[in-house]
Amino acid sequence: MASKKEQWKSDLYGDAVRDELEAFAEEGFESIPEDERDKWFTRFKFWGVFQQRTGQESYFMMRLTNANGVLEPGQLRTIAEVARDYATGPVDNPEFGNGWVDLTTRQSIQLHWLELEDIPEIWEQLESVGVTSRSAGGDTMRNITGCPVAGKDTHELVESKPLLDRFQSELREDDALSNMPRKFNISVTGCREGCAQDSINDIGLEPARKEVDGEVITGFNVRVGGGLGSRKPRVARSLDVFVADEERAYEVVRGFVELYHDHGNRDVRARARSRFFVDDWGTEKIRDRLESEYLDFELQSAGEDIRDEYTYNAGRPQSAGKSDHVGVHEQSDGRYYVGLSVAVGRLTAADALELADLADKYGSGKIRLTRRQNPIVMDVPAGALDDLLAEPLLSKHTPEPNPFQRGTVACTGTEFCSLALTETKARTARMLRWLRDNVEVPDDVHQLKIHYSGCTADCGQANTADIGLFGMRAQKDGEMVEAMDIGVGGGIGDEPSFVEWIHQRVPADEVPGAIASLVEAFAAHRTAGQTFRQWVEAEGPDAVAEYCEPIETDFEAPYMHDAKQSWYPFADEDEPPKTEQPMTSD
């Protein structure tokens, strides 16, 4: 029997939801019948509109979609103006103030504190510059990820941007495929670093070579069924398929989308993600069914991949190649791109506006977003680099961050998310400063990946980090406090692996001390040139667990209370201020 959400979606989903949402917006939030709100909020997600957590019921988050993280000239400016004018709440965040944009791990943007009544006007402003929130959430194809510098990378093996654009304009725009069994993630990359992380996507295209009729050609291998979350992560499995041209690559991906749409589990949501579909069917059966029912050509066996060259989140030393897009890098056209490091992926509206100004002044106006919650200024001439690097904004969001900031990712947390168990972003920002000031890192280590997810859904990709953190709760001194599970040794690259969880329910004020002890042990016991991931693999998780000592330090942890019991982690009041009418934006 189909789940309740499947019944709601079968009645109404996809593009048709927009008219209903706009009608509710015109009448106001209270016009949504209380006994129907779960149903409508499930449907609103397709249009990227998410109700915020308990206690914030009249406020919404909007997630945008921009395939491959590409923001054309003027788009970031408009997004920042929307954040300034509409994304302001009744209480300031002590670290970030009010009015900001959050950069995500799928190369997109989220805006918070929006009111339903403002959504149509927000859409009008965003869509006037080509920005959309369609298909940004819910059980549908989410934002397509890829190498953020596709088409500009000096070492790109396969040009992927035209294919990405086609997936965006044809596949994701197909309303007949809007209602999937669960969310569905697509990645495409032709670069040599592996930055699209095909291993943790529902379907991923990775660059490959194959000899055909005596000639070596380039194209893509196909992997399916990867994903994180619910303590049941999966590495995507090879479908044993090679596609050499754009048309066939498109058809294979579309075929798998349609196959999963038609045969994925719609009865048990906990088993509905494609990783379980691949578990149940197996890649051989999937390949056979694609050939017999969804494609009109014979599939070629997989080619030779270049995974042994992957350096992105691969746990390899810096000398092997770039592991992210932070810093100054030459483009294939002789210009440069400059990747900034934005701590925990949160840009104030003012900073986002200034970044848009700098992109216009020194580059082409184009911005691209990475899977590590960072922006890139594109197309900077060599003669403009020094002036750009001297701008005050680049002191704050530096292209030369310390190893802790460079490697850290944090999800939304209990500030807005109903699933999270802990506050994440403000705590992580404080922790980054403490680690920077108190913990020495070996000179040849330019990045330590610390990923913090507020719950086991793992939006912060903790499973793939050097040090992964899952939000939990624990008893301490007779009180319920925020806590974390600590894992070590995850990563993607040539041989993807997930963290080993070595400590459970560590009170949050003891986590910085635990991380410090890990890094100090790493520095003391590593062999020359060894990365943290390599060190964990060599030592073994049991030995590393012995080095890890959760302990209180002078780290100030003001957000220890169980935030799930409050309406907002940083509010003194028991509930948000009441208003007689929808709150106007400043």
UniProtKB/Swiss-Prot annotation:
Residues 566-586 are annotated as: Disordered. The keyword Coiled coil does not apply. PROSITE patterns: NIR_SIR. GO terms for biological process: nitrate assimilation. [4Fe-4S] cluster binds at C411, C417, C455, C459. InterPro entries: NIR_SIR_4Fe-4S, NiRdtase/SiRdtase_haem-b_fer, Nit/Sulf_reduc_fer-like_dom_sf, NO2/SO3_Rdtase_4Fe4S_dom, NO2/SO3_Rdtase_4Fe4S_sf, NO2/SO3_Rdtase_FeS/sirohaem_BS. Its cofactor is siroheme; [4Fe-4S] cluster. Siroheme binds at C459. Optimum temperature is 60 degrees Celsius. Inhibited by cyanide and azide. Belongs to the nitrite and sulfite reductase 4Fe-4S domain family. Catalyzes the reduction of nitrite to ammonium in the nitrate assimilation pathway, using ferredoxin as the electron donor. Can use reduced methyl viologen but neither NADPH nor NADH as electron donors. Monomer. This is Assimilatory ferredoxin-dependent nitrite reductase. It comes from Haloferax mediterranei (strain ATCC 33500 / DSM 1411 / JCM 8866 / NBRC 14739 / NCIMB 2177 / R-4) (Halobacterium mediterranei). The lineage of its organism: Archaea, Methanobacteriati, Methanobacteriota, Stenosarchaea group, Halobacteria.
